Design a protein with these regions (language model features):
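Hydrophobic face of amphipathic alpha-helices that form TPR/SEL1-like repeat modules
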Residues: 1-37, 364
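A structural signal for short, well-ordered beta-strand elements
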Residues: 31, 45, 67-68, 100, ...
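Residues at or immediately preceding the N-termini of alpha-helices
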Residues: 35, 49-52, 71, 89, ...
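Conserved C-terminal structural/oligomerization subdomain of aldehyde/semialdehyde dehydrogenase
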Residues: 37-43, 206-207, 231, 268, ...
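Glycine-rich loop-to-alpha-helix module at the N-terminal edge of alpha/beta enzyme cores
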Residues: 39-128, 139
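Rossmann-like NAD(P) dinucleotide-binding subdomain of oxidoreductase/dehydrogenase enzymes
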Residues: 130-277, 405
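ALDH superfamily catalytic-core signature
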Residues: 200, 241-386, 413, 450, ...
Length: 507
């Protein structure tokens, strides 16, 4: 496969790097099998503790130098990274699709997200601003400013094997931080490919060795990072269970954690909805990336007046979906990441049936020619209740639950009535409904949309959610502040020393 050669991916690959050179290691060997066809793409040698220490030590040394570079100069490096990513967009996007299983256009879109966040970060490098405040004391000035934090540990998930790392890294770098990346063991080759691209830019521009570390491996690497006091911030994307474990360990040492965890996202379909928009938003939201996005639409809350009509339209919309090799751009749905994910899908289907769910679009595992990997499943739709245990749980698969509501208050209560709080949406032409949904009494999610679906976030906005989603924010807006330490400054430019609150202390 030519795209692998272009990305310098071979049958066996080193998986530990300081950002400038590869590090010898004797850790776990990670084998990457494509869910597309079941073929072994390549292996990656993970980190042992010695290799881990090499990367962390280099990161510490690099931070001492990198933080002194002017922020716009750091931004220039990120700009060059973005230019290099543009050169390899097709090849890297193809690898994302082949190793993870998402459609080719989604793979290309993920690399475009990387490029977009580079562009955003370049502008940000000239806007890392604080605030100036008036002091109550005469002849004094107050302001706050932001300083680089240190090493940022990034633990990423398989479903977005490169974009989420870029969200964190590009912002961290312009903020003056250095990064250490532990990619998902299910998609290690995407990380190796990114590192190859980054190394080229960093070597040409004399970026300190250690600014961009890679530490491939299994759970033990994530545990080392979480417990490491030399890493002041750990950004972790994954399941709620994983996030709770990371958050507890990081919190025990009073470090910072940025957690991007599960979602159980819903679309409210109003009686005044544009049905065409609603159908497209619902179907793409539910089946895109084979239901493996954090923002995948998992629930439709449909007004009772249009429930039967909408249900019929929804079933008809599912009928022409093409399932198959995601490198074929005619396909709508690719495979799940692995056979464990297929097992989870089947278990969720059975659980839904046991609780009383009625499947109006039938589930199943596809077999035969072109489905040899065993990872292809049918997107399905079930009538269910919000109270079902399985509905309260996030299943990373294309399973969509639909249910009725009578009033907007009831719909919002159903939307909020799950442990997770990532993304939400309402499809309506009623201004009052839309504004209520967006108000303090509306959606309790970190993302709340009107007349678009729950997935497909742009990098300009902060991305993240509440409750068991973790509370972290990545990407745009002012998410950069989590990567820096805040400092308040008071300057006295007189020959006197008045105290605040009118206190006197005479000597």
């Amino acid at each position: 496969m030519n795209f692998l050669q272009t990305l310098n991916i071979s049958a066996t690959n080193k998986g530990v790097s300081t950002g400038v050179q590869w590090v010898k290691s004797k850790g776990e060997k990670l084998s990457s099998y494509s869910p597309v066809d079941g073929v072994l793409i390549g292996t990656v040698l993970g980190a042992d503790k010695e290799a881990y220490e090499v990367v962390i030590t280099k990161a510490q040394e690099a931070f001492a130098d990198w933080r002194l570079w002017p922020a716009p100069k750091r931004g220039e490096i990120v700009r060059l990274v973005g230019m290099e990513l543009r050169k390899f967009k097709t090849e890297l996007g193809t690898l994302v699709s082949y190793e993870m299983g998402k459609s080719l256009q989604e793979g290309m879109g993920e690399v475009q997200e990387m490029i977009d966040i580079c562009d955003f970060a370049v502008g940000l490098s000239r806007q890392l601003h604080g605030s100036t405040m008036h002091s109550e004391r005469p002849g004094h000035r107050m302001y706050d400013q932001y300083h680089p934090l240190g090493i940022v540990g990034i633990i990423s998930a398989f479903n977005f094997p490169v974009a989420v790392w870029a969200w964190n890294s590009m912002l961290a770098w312009v903020c003056g931080d250095v990064t250490v990346w532990k990619p998902s063991e299910k998609t290690p080759l995407c990380a190796v490919a990114c590192q190859q691209i980054i190394q080229t830019v960093f070597k040409k521009n004399n970026v300190p060795e250690g600014v961009c570390g890679l530490i491939s491996g299994g759970r033990d690497v994530g545990e080392w990072m979480s417990a490491d006091k030399r890493i002041p911030l750990v950004s972790a994307t994954g399941s709620t269970r994983m996030g709770k474990a990371v958050g507890a360990v990081v919190g025990e040492r009073l470090g910072r954690s940025l957690l991007e965890l599960g979602g159980n996202n819903s679309i409210i379909i109003s009686s005044e909805a544009d049905i065409n928009i609603a159908i497209t938003a619902a179907v793409f939201g539910a089946v895109g990336t084979a239901g493996q996005r954090c923002t995948t639409t998992r629930r439709l809350i449909i007004h009772e007046k249009i429930y039967n009509k909408f249900k019929e339209r929804l079933v008809n919309a599912y009928s022409p979906l093409k399932i198959g090799n995601p490198l074929n751009e005619k396909m709508h749905v690719g495979p799940l990441i692995d056979k464990d994910a297929v097992t989870n899908y089947l278990n969720a289907v059975e659980k839904c049936k046991e609780e009383g769910g009625n499947f109006i679009v039938e589930p199943g595992v596809l077999k035969g020619k072109a489905f040899e990997s065993g990872c292809y499943v049918k997107p399905c739709v079930a009538e269910a209740k919000n109270s079902y245990e399985i509905v309260q749980h996030e299943t990373f698969a294309p399973i969509l639950y639909i249910m009725k509501y009578k009033t907007i208050d009831e719909a919002i209560a159903m939307q909020n009535g799950v442990p997770q709080g990532l993304s939400s949406s309402i499809i309506t032409n009623n201004l009052r409904e839309a504004e209520q949904f967006l108000s303090h009494a509306g959606s309790d999610c970190g993302i709340a949309n009107v007349n678009i679906g729950t997935s497909g976030a742009e990098i300009g906005g902060a991305f993240g959610g509440e409750k068991e989603t973790g509370g972290g924010r990545e990407s745009g807006s002012d998410a950069w502040k989590v990567y820096m330490r805040r400092q308040t400054n008071t300057i006295n430019y007189t020959d006197k020393l008045p105290l605040a609150q009118g206190i006197r202390f005479d000597l």
